[in-house]
Amino acid sequence: MWSFARYTQKFCLRNLQLKNFSNKVKVSSLLFCSPNVRNISNWQCKRFTQSDAKDLASGVPSVKSDADQLQPKPTYNVSFTCTVCNTRSNHNFSKQAYHNGTVLVQCPKCKNRHLMADHLKIFSEERVTIEDILAKKGETFKKGYGQVINGNVVEFKPPQFKIRPAKSSSSNSSK
């Protein structure tokens, strides 16, 4: 019986098969396709580099050091009260999205969406953040550094009291 999923899988495999993974073959990138568990007709693809192709040819799995692993991306946490239903909630979003993209957060109770930042100019003619919006309304916006545990802010420090990491003793001894 013919199925779209099997045809796509065979098509992906045929396109990915290389006769020789030697140095003569310049493999800039490959796509590895695997079916999505939820829906067999959707395919997820992962890009492989030339070094991955060499590892596949030699049969040795590549082990990356801790330095090569991805570092956690900086995130922001905002706690706000929905103006529609007066529900207080916490939301996380990336620092990159807040400073370069458009961020909307959804109230968990009334499902209303609130604009936090719009640097892509989707909702207005100028780039705005929640700080600008609240300043125009005359409301306050508190910034700081802290810890959020189980949805509650445990420790909050204003920006001028940012805790800096202690200098290591090896850098002090080299002076």
From Swiss-Prot:
Signal among keywords: no
GO cellular component: mitochondrial matrix; mitochondrion
GO terms (BP aspect): protein folding; protein import into mitochondrial matrix; protein stabilization
One Pfam family per UniProt: zf-DNL
Keyword Zinc belongs to the record: yes
Alphabetized UniProt keyword annotations: Metal-binding, Zinc, Zinc-finger
Residues bound to Zn(2+): C82, C85, C107, C110
Zn-finger (DNL-type) residues: 71-166
UniProt GO molecular function: protein-folding chaperone binding; zinc ion binding
Protein name: Uncharacterized protein C24H6.02c
Annotated source species: Schizosaccharomyces pombe (strain 972 / ATCC 24843) (Fission yeast)
